[in-house]
């Protein structure tokens, strides 16, 4: 059985399999993926565009959505200004319109859950409000929340919506600690102009996919899978076929 969904349901499936026929269970249970932006990033404008697209496309309803932004302290304010400006320029509306950049949430119940996650947050610098109620659709302005600590609930919980949290960091070690400080580990993004730093970050980040100076790249020839409570097994590539096969060995003496 292969399941994509919440950790709660994934654990229930594992329990039922253990109590019944020991059916193999493979799980993809979402993520809380970080973008780590260092002050040596060569093109901060490109990084800002990628960060915004990485969280707000499909209204944040994507398993690898880059919902946590970690920015080095020396460029924090300037970078936040960039992403706020880009976000506020994006058009929210009818997904069938060619001018629309951000569509609706999947249901009113889900929209309300996302909005409720923002109710106790004080430092919203963009969005976070419901709009276009007259259309009967489930729309909101994408939200950016600053001054977040790595252990804050909004930083830890998968919102699965257009909400980006922003946290400052001071050093590479600090960034690694913050990026790994969740129970999920599906994807991550790193922005730096130093290849040696890129390799160190790829090795240190507890995520199944790490993007460097880009985000969201995918191909059917390479595996996609999570660390920690983002699940087990792999999708895509030849590795994904293993979970669908029962292997058998036969010894025959003639």
Model-derived features: where do they sit?
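Periplasmic-binding protein-like
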Residues: 1-4
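ALDH superfamily catalytic-core signature
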Residues: 7-149, 212
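Conserved C-terminal structural/oligomerization subdomain of aldehyde/semialdehyde dehydrogenase
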Residues: 36, 91, 132, 139-254
